[in-house]
Amino acid sequence: MHFIGVLNKDGGTFRTMDMAAFATSAERVFAEHGNSLECRVVAGADLAAELERAASDPSSDALLAGGGDGTISAAAGICFSHRMALAVLPAGTMNLFARSLGVPLQLDAAVA
């Protein structure tokens, strides 16, 4: 399965991380599980447009959204309109959406 990951570098946890290293690590973990992941790291101001591009990409089977509740909410709406599966990567302050779904709040565990 091919995922496109849109990672909001302005989201809580991501603000303090080396995003290039994280994206490379996440792509490697997906490959180890027989999937592919293409990470796109974006600023919050560019998030909606990139989510829309990713959901419209014919090579994508699912969208991985990384960020806080605002990022995940925007991604959910776009995925719904495109009838696309959404994977959640909690990287905000509260991560209420991820908590309600039982997604692990530690990034490494959520990626795995």
Across the structure, where does each feature detected by a protein language model lie?
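Glycine-rich beta-strand-to-loop/alpha-helix junction loops that act as flexible
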Residues: K9, G66-G68, L89-A91
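A short helix->loop->beta-strand "cap" motif at the edges of active sites that frequently abuts
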Residues: H82-A85
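Short glycine/serine/threonine-rich phosphate/pyrophosphate-binding segments
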Residues: G70-A75, L96
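Short, glycine-/small-residue-rich phosphate/pyrophosphate-handling segment
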Residues: T93-A112
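Short gly/ser-rich anion-binding loops that grip negatively charged ligand groups
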Residues: D61, A65, A87, S100
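Residue-level detector of secondary-structure boundary/capping sites
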Residues: M17, V88, G102-L105
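ATP/NTP phosphate-donor binding region
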Residues: M1-L63, S73, G77, D108-V111
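Short beta->alpha junction loops/turns
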Residues: A43-G44, G68-D69, V103
